[in-house]
C-alpha cells in the first residue's frame, strides 16, 4: 500500500510508476487459467532459472543428478525477450511521503540515482575497481553509522547505505541511505 503512494513519484515517467514487475494486481486476481499456463510456458525456461545446492555433498554425484533431472528440459524456440524499462532522471529532488497504520516505525530513504556500469565493460579492471570502491565506501559508512547507534543518544535506531539497483529497476542504479527513526 505504501508503494502505491510513493512509486508514482519515485518512478514518474516510467512503467514502474503504477505497475510492479509482476504486473497489475487486477490481472493477478482475475486471470483465466490459460493465461497462467501461457505465462509459465513463456517465462519458466532454462535461461531464466538457476539451481543452488548448499551442504556437505558429493559434488560429482549431485552434479550428475542435476544433469539427469534438468538436462532433458529443452530451451523453447522463439523465446520472449525479457525487457527492462528506463527510469528517467529528475532535475529537482523528489519527495514522497507515505503513511500506513500497520507501519510501526518511521523510516527515511534517500536515493541518489545514477546510470549503471555499461554491460560491455563488466569484464574489465575498471568494473572491478568500481565494485571495490563502492563496496568499500558502503562498508566504511555502515561501520560509522553502526558506531553511532552504540552511543548514549543515537540520532536513529538503525541506518545503512548501499549502492545497488534503484529499488526494482535494472536500468538505473542508486546510492541509497536508510535510517529508522525514533520518532
Spans of model-derived segments:
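Charge-rich, well-structured scaffold segments of protease-associated domains
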Residues: 1-80, 106-108, 114-119, 125, ...
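Conserved catalytic alpha/beta cores of large enzymes that bind or transform nucleotide phosphates
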Residues: 145, 150-151
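A generic structural signal for short, solvent-exposed coil/turn residues
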Residues: 43, 88-90, 100-102, 151, ...
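His/Glu-based metal-binding/catalytic segments typifying zinc-dependent metallopeptidases
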Residues: 8, 79-144, 178
